[in-house]
From Swiss-Prot:
Residue numbers on the Cytoplasmic membrane side: 261-335
Upper taxonomic lineage: Eukaryota, Metazoa, Chordata, Craniata, Vertebrata
Post-translational modification: Tyrosine phosphorylated.
Protein name: Leukocyte immunoglobulin-like receptor subfamily B member 4A
Name of the encoding gene: Lilrb4a
Signal peptide residue numbers: 1-23
Protein function: Inhibitory receptor involved in the down-regulation of the immune response. Receptor for FN1. Receptor for integrin ITGAV/ITGB3. Inhibits IgE-mediated mast cell activation, at least in part through interaction with ITGAV/ITGB3. Also inhibits KITLG/SCF-mediated mast cell activation. Through interaction with ITGAV/ITGB3, inhibits antibody production by memory and marginal zone B cells, probably by suppressing their differentiation into plasma cells. Inhibits IFNG production by CD8 T cells, CD4 T cells and natural killer cells.
Organism of provenance: Mus musculus (Mouse)
Induction (record text): Induced by lipopolysaccharide on neutrophils (at protein level). Induced by IL6 and LIF.
Keywords linked to the UniProt accession: Adaptive immunity, Cell membrane, Disulfide bond, Glycoprotein, Immunity, Immunoglobulin domain, Membrane, Phosphoprotein, Receptor, Repeat, Signal, Transmembrane, Transmembrane helix
Entry GO CC: cell surface; external side of plasma membrane
Topology of this chain in the membrane: Single-pass type I membrane protein
Glycosylated residues in this chain: N133, N191
Length: 335
């Protein structure tokens, strides 16, 4: 009887916090690992759990564990806590969740985070067909093989995209285990470094050493799209700007030539008007020469008064008398 009560009490202590967590109404926290969730053996890693400002304790829960794996008080910011793993080993590999508690109760569990340890086994070999340098739209295949009979292989793209593919291993007589990853219609998003790992089914978070790296370079096809690329648009804009500038320069040059021609014509017309005025105001000297000249002829004079106009700036005028001489012979007079 005492033993039964002890068992029931033990189960109550275990189930009570889990029931409170499951029934929690506080927002669930966020969990992540630094420097990442795939950690080489014997290196340190920090697991972070970020929740509410009212949190009093943060609990880290590992899958297949009965009690919280670790409990930490919040940092000075009070909205998160960190859990240190000084040296990564197989015992730390697994799936983790976190939650927090406050005066209002327990929060929900965070999303699951898989913490993987690499380096437990020898590395597999990675190859690519037909080439690591292909054009966009081509299908390629990665082959990951190992002398160790792994249960599965995983292909990982390192970098910002962080894509991964997992396949069950296949077996042949001369090749104990391998997996072929086919990527259909690759795009520039697949550019990057690829590695593969092997692991056993019963320990999915304990991987082998990383394979050799392969750098994949995907280039655009020449006729991939009828729309201009960014470089094409930039070139088109430069050409358009150049044409517009040329038209503006021609327009201003033509306008300048028109103004010059107009000023030249106006000046020429003004000069002609001045000459005509001077011709009308000046007296003309008319002479008449008879056909038969006689040294003894009589000279007649015809006087025509006129006024010489000087510059308009001068107000005084002078009278000038012009004489027109007419020479006639005596013989003409007698007649």
């Amino acid at each position: 009887m005492i033993a039964m009560l002890t068992v029931l009490l033990y189960l109550g202590l275990i189930l009570e916090p889990r029931t409170a967590v499951q029934a929690g109404h506080l927002p669930k926290p966020i969990i992540w690992a630094e420097p990442g969730s795939v950690i080489a053996a014997y290196t340190s890693v920090i697991t972070w759990c970020q929740g509410s400002w009212e949190a009093q304790y943060y609990h880290l829960y590992k899958e297949k564990s009965v009690n919280p794996w670790d409990t930490q008080v919040p940092l000075e910011t009070r909205n998160k806590a960190k859990f240190n793993i000084p040296s990564m080993t197989t015992s730390y590999a697994g799936i983790y969740k976190c939650y927090y508690e406050s005066a209002a109760g327990f929060s929900e569990h965070s999303d699951a985070m898989e913490l993987v340890m690499t380096g437990a086994y020898e590395n597999p070999s990675l190859s690519v067909y037909p080439s690591s340098n292909v054009t966009s739209g081509v299908s390629i295949s990665f082959s990951c093989s190992s002398s160790i009979v792994f249960g599965r292989f995983i292909l990982i793209q390192e970098g910002k995209h962080g894509l991964s593919w997992t396949l069950d291993s296949q077996h042949q007589a001369n090749q104990p285990s391998y997996a072929t990853f086919v990527l259909d219609a690759v795009t520039p998003n697949h550019n990057g470094t690829f590695r593969c790992y092997g692991y056993f089914r019963n320990e999915p978070q304990v991987w082998s050493k990383p394979s050799n790296s392969l750098d994949l370079m995907i280039s655009e096809t020449k006729d991939q799209s009828s729309t201009p690329t960014e470089d094409g648009l930039e070139t088109y804009q430069k050409i358009l700007i150049g044409v517009l500038v040329s038209f503006l320069l021609l327009f201003f040059l033509l306008l300048f030539l028109i103004l010059i021609g107009y000023q030249y014509g106006h000046k020429k017309k003004a000069n002609a008007s001045v000459k005509n005025t001077q011709s009308e105001n000046n007296a003309e000297l008319n002479s008449w020469n008879p056909q038969n000249e006689d040294p003894q002829g009589i000279v007649y004079a015809q006087v025509k008064p006129s006024r010489l106009q000087k510059d308009t700036a001068c107000k005084e005028t002078q009278d000038v008398t012009y004489a027109q001489l007419c020479i006639r012979t005596q013989e003409q007079n007698n007649s």
